[in-house]
Amino acid sequence: KRQFVRMAMIFQACRNSSAAFLKIQSDAGNGVQENAFLHNKYINYLITELKPVTGEIIRQGAADGLIVCQQPDALAEIVLLVLVVKLDNTLIPSTKEETEQTISELISLLEKGTDNPEGSLNFLKL
């Protein structure tokens, strides 16, 4: 189950870094174009840096028989895209409830798609 602890840490890192980046960006007073450029670089960096780590966690979980996954890196990218976009909340602005619903459905999809029992990935909830 250490894979789930590591995944929870990545989720927390996404949440914390998104909040910190948005605060810094709002305080910086940059122009719209510069903010968009920096935001794009930030999202790219976050996904690029976390994808190998997340993929390795998924591979380890599959090797340990905890999950079923044929393409760990693809699954890692899907998870990170949803988490980063929803937690960032600027590309597709959403209410807290909408974000919670999306994350809940991602959890349900992941549990079913990786043969994990219902509720086993609830640590991802906001």
Segments predicted by a language model, with ranges:
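Short alpha-helix boundary/capping elements
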Residues: Q12-N16, L83-L87, T114
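Hydrophobic alpha-helical connector segments
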Residues: K1-D27, A76-V79
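Amphipathic alpha-helical core segments of compact helical bundles
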Residues: I47, K51, L80-V84, D88, ...
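Short secondary-structure transition hinges
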Residues: N16-L66
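C-terminal peripheral helix-coil segments that are non-catalytic and often amphipathic
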Residues: P52, E56-A63, N89-L126
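Short, hydrophobic secondary-structure boundary micro-motifs
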Residues: L22-D27, Q70, G119-F123
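All-alpha amphipathic helical-bundle segments outside canonical DNA-binding/catalytic cores
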Residues: V5, Y45-L46, R59-I78, E97-Q101
